[in-house]
């Protein structure tokens, strides 16, 4: 059995870093060592920023985004088209769409997808909040931007069913060939989706 070569504080730092998605035990050790070597330039400021985030970050009561204000800056941005809502599974999806910069719309974060096998039902997600937002009026389009998984498609169909009878256009993201992708490397499902979502040029 290997002997411990660091104190409990450093071990705790490594264990906590290893819980971050994308970091395993080895990567966590490297990250911890890098932070410790750059104690004044990185570890101190990171510790301060994390403390501030812990104290100030909240979930937007309107859309489910994370921010330091409620409602969040996306919901209060008068430059956005608040009549169009892009529905996403998670905050990371919202951030990804914002990086793309293709639309200047509002968002609604569901907090996951329906998954009966995992015990995730409609009441476990932020679906009621979405239905309430649409019911308030002023929404002309919902863009369902969930992942192309069975759970994502089930969630999209459930939302569509719940909004039947309301005067709102419901669309979903096109699925298909990625920019720069080669047809020979794509699976049959992706190719079929691309053919169905074809557009006029």
Swiss-Prot record:
Per UniProt, residues of the Toprim domain are: 83-178
Q: Indicate whether ATP-binding appears among the record's keywords.
A: no
SUPFAM superfamilies documented for this protein = Recombination protein RecR (SSF111304)
One GO BP annotation is: DNA recombination
Where on the tree of life does the source sit, at the highest rank? Bacteria
The signal peptide, as residue positions, is none
Q: Which InterPro entries match?
A: DNA_Rcmb_RecR, Rcmb_RecR, Rcmb_RecR_Znf, TOPRIM_dom, TOPRIM_RecR
Which key words are in the record?
A: DNA damage, DNA recombination, DNA repair, Metal-binding, Zinc, Zinc-finger
Its Gene Ontology molecular function terms? DNA binding; zinc ion binding
SMART domains named among the record's database cross-references: TOPRIM
Q: Where are the zinc fingers (C4-type)?
A: 60-75
Q: Which Pfam families match?
A: RecR_C, RecR_HhH, Toprim_4
- Which protein family is it in? Belongs to the RecR family.
The role this protein plays is: May play a role in DNA repair. It seems to be involved in an RecBC-independent recombinational process of DNA repair. It may act with RecF and RecO.
Q: What is this protein called?
A: Recombination protein RecR
Species this protein is from: Rhizobium johnstonii (strain DSM 114642 / LMG 32736 / 3841)
């Amino acid at each position: 059995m290997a002997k411990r070569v660091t104190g409990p504080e450093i071990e705790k730092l490594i264990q906590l870093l290893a819980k971050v998605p994308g970091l395993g035990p080895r990567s966590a050790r490297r990250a911890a060592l890098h932070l410790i070597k750059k104690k004044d330039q990185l570890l101190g400021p990171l510790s301060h920023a994390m403390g501030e985030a812990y104290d100030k970050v909240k979930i937007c009561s309107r859309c489910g985004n994370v921010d330091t204000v409620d409602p969040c800056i996306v919901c209060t941005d008068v430059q956005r088209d608040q009549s169009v809502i892009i529905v996403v599974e998670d905050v990371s999806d919202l951030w990804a769409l914002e990086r793309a910069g293709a639309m200047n719309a509002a968002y609604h974060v569901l907090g996951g997808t329906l998954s009966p096998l995992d015990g995730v039902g409609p009441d476990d997600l932020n679906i009621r909040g979405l239905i309430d937002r649409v019911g308030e009026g002023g929404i002309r389009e919902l863009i369902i931007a969930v992942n192309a998984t069975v759970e994502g498609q089930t969630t999209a169909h459930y939302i569509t069913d719940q909004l039947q009878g309301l005067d709102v256009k419901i669309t979903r993201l096109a699925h298909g060939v990625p920019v720069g992708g080669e047809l020979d490397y794509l699976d049959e499902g992706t190719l079929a989706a691309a053919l169905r979502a074809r557009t006029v040029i």
